[in-house]
Structures are given as structure tokens and as C-alpha cells.
């Protein structure tokens, strides 16, 4: 480059120059790279979606938002940043959600099923999990220990593409089931199988509280109890 620039600088106006040039071929061409991009399913998970219409809609909406996201090698995915704040203005509906140990209606309730399904797909893809938090209770839609709770302004779910090639998140919803796939390029024969083992259980404790709004002798369950494990 310096030689060419020097010749141009010293040339007379209108002078024709003959310059030596060497063509360097890339180690990998665009066509070669395109042929291997997203050719393999690194990991795939399917969970059954149930509940109110609002909850199902929230799961479908959040899944649609993350579908098609591409991460280059070394890039990190944030569920909260990608999905964004869950508001009614953005199409999310009130639905049951776990809040401080209680089940209450919250805008965006149910989106943890999307993050949990994604989390398990990432585990099966052998991706690097950089941030993940479990629910206080074991959700019914996924195996124990395979969930990932999220909350706007609170817990997030993050993972990093630790492969040599770009990866893509692909989601679909059909027949009451949410499917999450991680597409990428396999470079070895590594195979991931997830298992869990129950080490202990913790029985719940029944706590009674006075409530003047109820008729004498009436009982009302405030929070559905679960056995911890």
C-alpha cells in the first residue's frame, strides 16, 4: 500500500502507472461460511403451555420476541434486554406469577416458561450460562432444576455463545407446546444429557392468620403450599 501511494504521489498529471499487485485469497470464503452457518441443531426443548389465555399469550409473545436472535462467537444474550419491559402497552396481559413467595396476577405472568425452556435448550447446546436464578417453587412445566426465573428490574437470564460460529435462537408454538431450538455449527461430537437427583425434601408449614374480612369459622388459602426439594 505504501509503495502504491508513493507512486501516485510522485506521478505527473495524466501519467499512466503500471503497478504490481498480488491477489490474496481469504482462508474462508463467504459461500463456504454460509454453507455451515446454522446447519446443526445444537439443542432443542419442548414444554407444554397451559393456564389462562393471558398467560399463554404472554408465553407466545415473549417467545416470538427472542426468535431469530443471532449471537456471534463470544457475544452474550440477556433475556430482559431482549424481551424488554413487560407492559400492557406492549401487548402483555395480567396472568399468575410468583412474587415474593406468593402467586399473584402480574402483567407478563408466564414469561418465565419461555426463559426456562430457553435455558434448558442452552444447557443441551453446551453453551456458557452466565446468569441464572431458580424459582422458589418447581414449575410444573419443566423438570426440577431446569428452570430460569426472570423479572424486569430483577433476576435476568444470560448466556454466552462459547462456540466458534454464530448461533441462532428459533422458537415455535403449536398444539399447546413451546419449542426452542439453538441452531449453530457442530465442530465435535460432544453430546449433552441432563439429569437431576433429589437430595432431600422440605415439608411446608401451615401458618394461620386472622382475617376479619372472613366469616367466623371460614378458612381461605392465601398461598398454595409446595413441598420443597
Predicted regions: what they are:
Residues 1-229:
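Well-ordered beta-sheet/strand-loop patches within structured domains
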